[in-house]
Each structure stands twice: as C-alpha cells, then as structure tokens.
Amino acid sequence: MKYQQLENLEAGWKWMYLFNKHRMGESITCYIDSSEEQQMVNVFLKLEHEPVHVLEWIQKHMNPDLQNKLKQAIRAKRKRHFNAEQEHTRKKSIDLDYRVWEKLSLRAQELDSTLSDTIEYLLSEASRTEKASQTVSSLKADLHELLK
C-alpha cells in the first residue's frame, strides 16, 4: 500500500533516526577522519528544525551503510503514522507473559490466523459460552419454579 510522503515531517523523522544512531555510537557520516566526522555531526545537530537542510545534509554526508536502514525505518514510520489516523487501522499493544503468548501463538497456529484474530475469536467464543450458560441457568430456574 502506498502512503503519501510528507517531506517536512519525514525530514524530522530522518533527523531523529540519525540522531539516535549517533547517540548510540554509530557513525552517521561517510567520513573516516574523526575530526571531519565530528564537524559534520555538529552541523547535523544544528539542523533539527530545518527540514530542507537536513535532506541536503543526508544526501551529501550520510554514511552509505545507513541508507537502506533509514529508508526501511521511514517506510515503517510512515505506515504507522497513516494507520494511526483511522480507528480500525490503529495499532494497540499489550504486554503478555511469555507462557501466555506461547499458548496464544499455538492457538493462532492451530486456527491458521493472526494473534489479533485469535484473540477476537476466543473472546467471541467465551461470550457465546457465557450466554449459553445463562440460558441453561434460566431454563433450570424456570423448570424448578414449574415443578414446585
């Protein structure tokens, strides 16, 4: 699925991606000389709120090894950004204990479905079982009243 590219917004994402890589100690420039690299990093850090200059800096100075990773990260971020706009495509996360995740994963494999679909299926089954149980209880109570 294609998503609209928003240059200013994505330039900010790219800046943040490279900033985080730099903070983690990775080389974000194409330069080998440490003084030249540091100089270009300092220039880069000043460009945070200048999207056009960020894109120019990336074209001229970014480490070529990061090119594909950056594209993939931005593509994923773009997808999440646009999916978050609509309620039915918005993703939610939950924390599961490992053994719970393992059971859910096995059940999903048995049903040949996603984890989300499996959770939805299990909830509907539980609801159906609860309604059936209430109906049986109601019938028992009615029968008990009739037999008095």
From Swiss-Prot:
Signal peptide: none
Organism from which the protein derives: Aliivibrio salmonicida (strain LFI1238) (Vibrio salmonicida (strain LFI1238))
Keywords: Cell cycle, Cell division, Cytoplasm, DNA-binding
Cell location: Cytoplasm
HAMAP family named in the record: MatP
Role according to the record: Required for spatial organization of the terminus region of the chromosome (Ter macrodomain) during the cell cycle. Prevents early segregation of duplicated Ter macrodomains during cell division. Binds specifically to matS, which is a 13 bp signature motif repeated within the Ter macrodomain.
Tree of life domain: Bacteria
Name of the protein in question: Macrodomain Ter protein
GO cellular component, one term: cytoplasm
Subunit note: Homodimer.
Family: Belongs to the MatP family.
GO BP terms in the entry: cell division; regulation of DNA-templated transcription
InterPro entries: Arc_rbn_hlx_hlx (IPR013321), MatP (IPR009390), MatP_C (IPR035375), MatP_N (IPR035087), MatP_N_sf (IPR038339)
Entry's Gene Ontology molecular function annotations: sequence-specific DNA binding
Chief place where the protein resides: cytoplasm
